Amino acid sequence: MPKMKSVKGAVKRFKVKKNGTIKRGSAFRSHILTKMSQKRKRNLRGPKTVHSTNVAGILSTLCKA
């Protein structure tokens, strides 16, 4: 049987924490931020966690399921 290969784009975007939750970054934070309010930019700051309904799919792309 061939080796399981992880999706390289998913490896770069997600990190699995010790308690099993998955850490992700926020979208819409790269450029053209002048038209966005300070409150919206502040809420997009920092790492977020993946919702529980998406965890199984992401773990399978990372070959950790």
Curated annotation (Swiss-Prot):
PROSITE patterns: RIBOSOMAL_L35 (PS00936)
Protein name, per record: Large ribosomal subunit protein bL35
Family recorded in the similarity comment: Belongs to the bacterial ribosomal protein bL35 family.
UniProt xrefs under NCBIfam families: rpmI_bact
InterPro entries reported in the protein's UniProt record: Ribosomal_bL35 (IPR001706), Ribosomal_bL35-like (IPR021137), Ribosomal_bL35_CS (IPR018265), Ribosomal_bL35_sf (IPR037229)
Gene3D superfamilies the record matches: 4.10.410.60
Biological process, per Gene Ontology: translation
Gene Ontology cellular-component annotations: cytosolic large ribosomal subunit
UniProt KW keywords: Ribonucleoprotein, Ribosomal protein
A GO molecular-function annotation: structural constituent of ribosome
